[in-house]
């Protein structure tokens, strides 16, 4: 996996917001010095020209919170191979984000027990403080008929996780375009939603569905190429 600072997921510099500050990385403009401003932000050349202390003003940058949502619902996959590929995709995205020092949440479907009277609407957040722990937890997940589908997982993740900037929805070939659209609508405006359909029998590809980026991959190696292509088209 390439660094999450490139392509679609790039955010080391951040996306500037309209909020102004005196201590961030996106330079915006100069203004007159005010009591309490740090001297290190004084712009000496402009100060000399105007005869008044001038300081740099910046735009705040939006730090990236990546969410990787993996469905464990049997109905979202046509084969065990699809599910295994989906788990590998979730692991690759999560590990890359952890190694890049990003804020990342990896969530999977909750499975409703047989004795429960109603469906449990929740997701399980996996450990993301170190790559090895995340991979250990992914190694024991499995599909289940009683697991929440990708639409429910997306909706709950959107409610539970604050400050999401990029959401990856990882599923199999049985997830329909309508279900993916509904899942993407769970996230607030401004969140980049990317659905990754894992299908070893399919030709890798990219398409846009109502503002949603949909990547189809047949092998894990396709993921890097697919993400790079998405960034080029977006």
Predicted regions and their residues:
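Membrane-proximal, non-transmembrane interaction regions of membrane/secretory-pathway proteins
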Residues: 1-7
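Intrinsically disordered, low-complexity linkers and stems that provide flexible hinges
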Residues: 10-33
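Exposed, interaction-prone extracellular/peripheral surfaces
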Residues: 12, 32-234
